[in-house]
């Protein structure tokens, strides 16, 4: 029984995370970003969102949380390193990578509020 309960919790958390990623993507679209990838997976890790605005590439970690501050705290050093490695791999596959500046952001998706965008969070 415990395994089924954990499995249901995991599925529920995964659905909540996917919904948060789509809300964050919509919010960024409204802010003028173009979404290049959602849940970009590499052997080094996953990037929740990759967005572009002019000559800027934003690598975005999305967190569904009750408060924005806890979302920023939830992205620890190990997660940051994994995201950076995945971003480096993504960039290495682009011929035009040299013309972009790169930034790492966090978007906190909060209940009954607009998402909070933490620019250059790490």
UniProtKB/Swiss-Prot annotation:
It comes from the Bacteria. InterPro entries: Restrct_endonuc-II-like, tRNA_endonuc-like_dom_sf, UPF0102_YraN-like. Pfam families: UPF0102. Signal peptide: none annotated. GO terms for molecular function: nucleic acid binding. NCBIfam families: PRK12497.1-5, YraN family protein. Belongs to the UPF0102 family. PANTHER family: UPF0102 PROTEIN YRAN (PTHR34039:SF1). This is UPF0102 protein Atu0303.
């Amino acid at each position: 029984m415990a395994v089924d309960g954990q499995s249901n919790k995991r599925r529920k958390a995964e659905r909540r995370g996917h919904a948060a990623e789509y809300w964050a993507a919509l919010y960024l679209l409204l802010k003028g970003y173009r979404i290049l990838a959602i849940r970009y997976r590499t052997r080094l890790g996953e990037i929740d969102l990759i967005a572009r605005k002019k000559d800027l590439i934003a690598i975005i970690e999305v967190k569904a949380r009750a408060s924005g501050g806890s979302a920023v705290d939830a992205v620890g050093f190990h997660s940051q390193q994994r995201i950076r490695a995945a971003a480096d791999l993504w960039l290495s596959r682009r011929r035009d990578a040299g013309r972009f500046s790169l930034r790492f952001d966090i978007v906190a998706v909060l209940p009954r509020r607009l998402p909070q965008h933490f620019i250059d969070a790490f």
